[in-house]
A protein has these predicted regions:
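Active-site-adjacent helical/loop segments in soluble small-molecule enzymes
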Residues: 20-76
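Catalytic cores of large soluble enzymes that bind and process phosphate-bearing ligands
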Residues: 2, 15, 19, 34-41, ...
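A conserved regulatory-domain signal marking ACT and ACT-like small-molecule sensing domains
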Residues: 89-189
Length: 189
């Protein structure tokens, strides 16, 4: 048995530094393999279960789904027991947001535009032509000391995944806009 110095995870229902004295003998007798999963795998499992099965399962209860990605189960009948729905709405929202960002379905980019009428429209037309769905748009004239040098446009978009995200960014670049992906973690701010 190994004692951990700390147990920090979004799966707080199983975040223990030391296995319990009563449970450990059963685990030792009946478990033939253990896996170490990180929180990003739980976020992926949460989004999969929510989108595909329309279920809300707390993080500790998602461990079997996350573990399946590490096991060779093709062609086999496998049952994953999902348990627990003890999750507050803020946590749920955070998991969905992080999952969508990881999958390239939400992303933010910044671009410098000339400060003249029509610049924003040109970007909007490229986004529309490439099926980019705007979630948030910030047109900031005050980011540069000299407004004559341009304005900054930050756009948070919904996309279909990483390939679609790259298609949108490449379409902007092909039209002369130097679009740079930025941190999407604060897109609600």
């Amino acid at each position: 048995m190994i004692n951990l110095p700390a147990a920090t995870t979004i799966a707080d229902g199983v975040a223990v530094k030391t296995p319990g004295d009563k449970v450990f003998p059963y685990v030792q007798k009946n478990v033939d393999r253990t896996l170490v999963l990180d929180d990003s795998e739980l976020v992926e499992a949460f989004l999969d279960v929510m989108e595909r099965h329309k279920m809300v399962v707390e993080n500790a209860g998602l461990l079997p789904v996350a573990a399946l990605r590490h096991l060779d189960c093709r062609g086999k009948n496998v049952v994953s027991i999902l348990s627990g729905g003890n999750m507050d709405v803020i946590t749920m929202s955070s998991l969905v947001q992080h999952g969508l960002i990881r999958r390239g379905r939400i992303f933010t980019f910044a671009v410098q535009l000339p400060d003249r009428p029509g610049s924003l429209l040109a970007v909007a037309q490229i986004l529309a032509a490439n099926n980019g769905n705007v979630i948030k748009l910030e047109h900031n004239q005050f980011v540069n000391i000299n407004r004559q040098s341009g304005v900054e446009l930050r756009v948070t978009l919904e996309a279909f995944g990483h390939d679609h995200k790259e298609q949108i960014l490449n379409a902007l670049r092909a039209q002369g806009f130097h679009a740079v992906e930025t941190d999407t973690a604060d897109f609600y701010n």
